[in-house]
Amino acid sequence: MRIHVRVVPRAKRGGVEPLPDGSLKVRVSAPAEDGRANAAVIEALAEYFDVPRRAVIIRQGVTGRSKLIEILQGT
């Protein structure tokens, strides 16, 4: 499954919020430095979809706030 994600780094509170267009807004407290926000996004989405972290892959947007995420099923 592939989903579009909009990331908000350095948020006061973290969480995953579905948006009307079918994408997700992911708020993380980690800063967008040295991949810390990406790691926090992977952690948040793994928890949200109840899958292991290794099942969450950033396909596009590693350096931006808009990302294309792939969730691998059956891992």
Which positions does each model-derived feature cover?
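Solvent-exposed beta-strand sheet faces enriched in polar/charged residues
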Residues: 6-8, 27, 59, 72
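C-terminal structural segments of small proteins and small subunits
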Residues: 34, 42-75
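A generic structural motif
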Residues: 11, 21-23, 64-66
